[in-house]
Amino acid sequence: MNRDDAGLVNNPLRANIALTLERERAKRGLSHMHMAELFRTAEGEKLAYRTYIQTVRQKNNVTLATLQIMANGLQLSFAGLLAGGKKVPEWAHRLDDNAIRKRLAHIIDFERQRRNLHRYEMAELIGVAEATFTKLERASGNVSVDTIAAIAKALKLDPATFLFSEKIPPGRADT
C-alpha cells in the first residue's frame, strides 16, 4: 500500500486502530507514555513506545501479534480494534490473532473456490507472491494490517468488517 505526502497509508484498519487507541487513552486519562506502559507480551516484555506511537500516528504497518498485545493490554477484543466502532457479530469478539489468521485463510479459500480460481490466480488477484499466498492459506506467519486491507480491497470487501462477515460461512476454526 502506498503512502501519501504526509507519510500515511490509506488503510481504514490503521485509522480504526489509531482511533480506538486514542479513544481508550482519553477514556483512561493517560499520557501516551503511560498508555504504552499497558502493552506487554505474555512474558512481561514491554512493547516499544515507538511501536505504539507510530501505530497511533498510522505510520506503522502493525502485525496481528502486536495487535494481540495491544488488545490484551486494553482488555479489548481484536474485533474492537479492527472494526473501529462498526458493529460486528458477538462471536467476532472472541477471536484472537491465531483465530484471525485462520479466519483470513478460510475467507481466502472460500473466495477462491467461489470464483473458481487456481491458487496462483488467487495470489495474483490479491496481489501477493505465491509463497505469501501459501502462508496466508495455511494461516502461518505474522500478517500485517496492510496485507489484510489489500486482500479486502482486491476482493471488493470492507477491510474493517470482512473478517467478521456473516455472509461468509464460518470455517472449522470459527466459533
Regions found by a protein language model. Give the residues of each.
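A short, Lys/Arg-rich alpha-helix, primarily the initiator
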Residues: 1-30, 88-114
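Alpha-helical residues within the helix-turn-helix
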Residues: 26, 37, 72, 113, ...
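Key DNA-contact positions within bacterial/archaeal DNA-binding proteins
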Residues: 33, 50, 79, 120, ...
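Short alpha-helical "recognition helix" segments of helix-turn-helix
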Residues: 34-41, 121-123
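Recognition helix of helix-turn-helix/homeodomain-like DNA-binding domains
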Residues: 40-62, 127-143
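DNA major-groove recognition helix of helix-turn-helix/homeodomain DNA-binding modules
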Residues: 63-80, 144-161
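Short amphipathic recognition helices of helix-turn-helix/homeodomain-type DNA-binding modules
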Residues: 68, 73, 80-96, 161-175
